[in-house]
UniProtKB/Swiss-Prot annotation:
PROSITE patterns: GATB. This is Glutamyl-tRNA(Gln) amidotransferase subunit E. It catalyses: L-glutamyl-tRNA(Gln) + L-glutamine + ATP + H2O = L-glutaminyl-tRNA(Gln) + L-glutamate + ADP + phosphate + H(+). It comes from Methanospirillum hungatei JF-1 (strain ATCC 27890 / DSM 864 / NBRC 100397 / JF-1). Heterodimer of GatD and GatE.
Length: 614
């Protein structure tokens, strides 16, 4: 089905969060090294509470988060300190990180703020030990080369990494993060994805951003006419952005259709809670049979709508379940999907009878501890009443495939307040003017094709590679571009597909090997086995010795003479055409220890001698 996004009034904007590849964190001198949870050296526990803003208001998103009283566990390392623990004041803002953000702002033709003030953004989901995230506005009002507007660029501290629901790792907390916010100027799913790709290209062009899964996240703001602004958090895959937008448009259209149907039916929400625990004492449903309390409500004339699909894999009932889960319950049951899950038809009949439900009504039940059931039912009633409004303003999280689930209400202005522990930073015109704009990756691709003779796809791979700088350094050191590309790109890709841990190989080790190859000390044919050895943790010297043990010219001559003698009849029969096959046998035996040109020269002389004596 073709969707007319212009007719629907689609408006979208995007926020991109990218980790910066700095030596130190934003407000302490700890390294920005990602660790494994098993390497943790200690732990501590916290409960988090929301604080009121300067105006005495409590942020609605934080208020909802406080519904769940949770104890958070934090893992510490020998690369984290008391700043991450929120037991020591923050150090001054990282100047290296600020220069990177200012450079990106300059690329986007933005105006830097004259003085940077750090703010506190209230976050009590456990991802910050302090209960807030530090963020600073750096620049405003810019444009991308494609025309999309950039509203703001901020410098933030990264959140802690969630290991489990209430367990967080502090290795990531405090890594400098750039937040780029576009204006709501996009009107098709494809435009959103293209804009994200363009921003990603600019970020990578700096050579100062981290790479890998989790280092970049896209938040998408979407609304349609008569709908509402919804923020979708944490889209990590660029290729999924357009699909996420399409599915959110589908969801909002479906919710608006449900709104109109509810009005047409004269539907209503019955707020009386009914205890139906006794109806399921002998149920085949393990969840219901073992539950200490089962409560039910009747949604008048909601039949068929709670179970209606609003986007792939999601129904209106899924939305209600998301709200209920905020109270700690596992979910809900509703009569649009029953009998099922061990609930029999007789139990459904008795349930409807207990609530005086007609065939036009939908009954929802929740099973858990009494207090949780009460809380969950109030949330379900709240979400059911929102259905009469259409689309609620929400922050949502992306699910696999591109559909989304409710996270929390959209935060308000009460979420932000000044950070009193961090000094302001002046941004002088001289400082901003001194920053050099990096070469954009599109221009790098064109240059690699023209200067180095690389094919377009190879040039693109090399330009986007995190080893790009080392590749250029190798060429400036006298290494031929084709060999440098093999070493820093194509061979590493092949080895990675074979399972080699190529991320362990240091750029300087590859460069050292290339210098040895260029000097003739190591044959270029040995490049792949040498890189394999480097991936296993060998030093360049050890890797070369293992993969390409030195063979003297005298030893090589003996090897060639022996192989030629063994194949004398074949050589006499084929003449000079035998050179290729015999060359392959020799190269296999010397295993790249000798340059192919030298082997070819000695072999041709040996074959010539055999043919001369024939």
């Amino acid at each position: 089905m073709t969707i007319d996004y212009q007719k629907l009034g689609l408006i979208a904007g995007i926020e991109i969060h990218q980790q910066l590849n700095t030596k130190e964190k934003l407000f302490c001198r700890c390294p920005t090294t990602i660790r494994e949870a098993e390497e943790s050296k200690g732990e501590f526990f916290r409960y988090l509470r929301a604080t009121k803003s300067e105006m005495g208001e409590l942020d609605r998103a934080a208020e909802e988060e406080m519904m769940q009283v949770r104890q958070f566990r934090y893992l510490t390392y020998d690369t984290t300190c008391l700043v991450e623990n929120d037991e020591e004041p923050p150090a001054p803002l990282n100047e290296e990180a600020l220069d990177i953000v200012l450079t990106i702002a300059k690329v986007c033709r933005m105006t830097p703020v004259p003085e940077i003030h750090t703010m506190r953004k209230l976050v009590i989901d456990g991802s910050n030990t302090s209960g807030f995230q530090r963020t600073a506005l750096v620049a405003m009002n810019g444009t991308l080369p494609g025309g999309a507007g950039i509203e703001t660029v901020c410098l933030e501290e990264e959140a802690a990494q969630r290991i489990e629901d209430t367990i967080f790792s502090l290795d990531r907390l405090g890594i400098p993060l750039i937040e780029i916010t576009t204006s709501p100027c996009m009107h098709t799913p494809e435009a959103v994805q293209e804009t994200a790709a363009q921003i990603g290209m600019i970020l990578r062009s700096t050579g100062k951003v981290k790479r890998g899964l989790g280092t970049i996240r896209q938040d998408i703001n979407i609304s349609i006419r008569e709908g509402a602004r919804v923020e979708i958090k944490g889209v990590q895959e660029l290729d999924l952005i357009a699909e996420v937008v399409r599915r959110e448009v589908c969801r909002q259209v479906s919710l608006l259709e449900i709104r109109e149907e509810l009005k047409k039916r004269g539907a209503s929400v019955e707020k009386t809670l009914v205890d139906v625990t006794s109806l399921f004492t002998d149920s085949k449903s393990r969840v219901l049979k073992s539950a200490p309390k089962i409560l039910a409500i009747r949604l008048n004339k909601f039949a068929g709508l709670v179970g209606r699909e609003i986007q792939p894999g999601r129904r209106l009932g899924s939305e209600m379940s998301d709200y209920a889960k905020k109270c700690g319950v596992g979910g809900l049951f509703h009569t649009d999907e029953l009998p099922a899950y061990g609930v029999t038809e007789d139990e459904v009949t008795n349930l409807k009878k207990a609530l005086d439900a007609t065939p036009d009504d939908c009954v929802i039940i929740v099973a858990d501890k009494p207090q949780r059931c009460q809380c969950a039912m109030q949330q379900i009633i709240r979400r059911a009443e929102m259905a009469f409004e259409g689309v609620p303003k929400e922050t949502r999280k992306m699910l696999e495939g591109g559909s989304t689930a409710y996270m929390r209400p959209l935060p308000g202005a009460a979420r932000m307040y000044p950070e009193t522990d961090v000094f302001q930073v002046r941004v002088t015109p001289e400082r901003f003017a001194s920053l050099e704009i990096p070469e954009m990756i599109d221009d790098t691709i064109a240059r690699y094709m023209q200067e180095f003779g690389l094919a377009r796809e190879v040039a693109r791979q090399m330009a986007y590679s995190e080893r790009r700088s080392a590749f250029e350094e190798a060429i400036h050191s006298g290494i031929k571009p084709a060999l440098a590309e093999r070493a820093f790109n194509s061979t590493l890709r092949e080895l990675s597909r074979e399972g080699a841990q190529v991320h362990r190989i240091k750029d300087e080790d590859i460069l050292q090997v290339l210098i040895l190859i260029n000097s003739g000390e190591v044959a270029k044919e040995a490049l792949s086995p040498i890189l394999t050895a480097l991936a296993e943790g060998k030093t360049p010297a050890e890797a070369c010795e293992r993969a390409a043990p030195k063979v003297s010219e005298e030893e090589l001559t003996k090897i060639i003479n022996r192989i030629v003698a063994e194949r004398a009849d074949f050589i006499k029969e084929r003449g000079n055409a035998a050179t290729g096959p015999v060359m392959g046998v020799v190269m296999k035996e010397v295993r790249g220890s000798v340059d192919g040109k030298i082997v070819n020269q000695i072999l041709r002389e040996a074959i010539s001698q055999v043919l001369k004596n024939a």
